[in-house]
């Protein structure tokens, strides 16, 4: 069974975008390609257990096993060597992607303290949107009592839109709460 947002895209979002931007072909209509979750764990250099906790939390949040990211080059000031594990990332596609986006928009973002909407300035000029979350506790899957320290994560929503305006309209149609 397809995800709720996937159905919503086919029935409402795609036709609305086609009408607003006057696309000639259905292949021109922007859609969400993937969502990438990245958690940088800088203190994993001194304590590898911190990375394991981050991987476990990212697994709970995303529903799939993260890829551990390695340092590309050595930096002496950070006591960092090339090839050391310093973070974790997950790429979501398909139904998992739509399920995560639904959860993010309707459950997790409203749990952020003093939430007034996400920034409209976080588009990259090519139709992709980046969102930073300061603490992982906004996700329901994370048990508050088992968290040793709060960690932030980056959420990148990659779309097939050519412009930021198209991507903003796509995410607005999905219900992304942009700040006024």
From Swiss-Prot:
GO aspect biological process, one term:
translation
Q: Which terms in the Gene Ontology molecular function aspect does this entry carry?
A: rRNA binding; structural constituent of ribosome; tRNA binding
Q: Which GO terms describe its cellular component?
A: ribonucleoprotein complex; ribosome
Going by the UniProt record, its keywords in alphabetical order are: Ribonucleoprotein, Ribosomal protein, RNA-binding, rRNA-binding, tRNA-binding
Q: Which InterPro entries match?
A: Ribosomal_uL5 (IPR002132), Ribosomal_uL5_bac-type (IPR020930), Ribosomal_uL5_C (IPR031309), Ribosomal_uL5_CS (IPR020929), Ribosomal_uL5_dom_sf (IPR022803), Ribosomal_uL5_N (IPR031310)
Family per record: Belongs to the universal ribosomal protein uL5 family.
In terms of NCBIfam families, this protein maps to: PRK00010.1 (NF000585)
Subunit organization: Part of the 50S ribosomal subunit; part of the 5S rRNA/L5/L18/L25 subcomplex. Contacts the 5S rRNA and the P site tRNA. Forms a bridge to the 30S subunit in the 70S ribosome.
Q: What is this protein called?
A: Large ribosomal subunit protein uL5
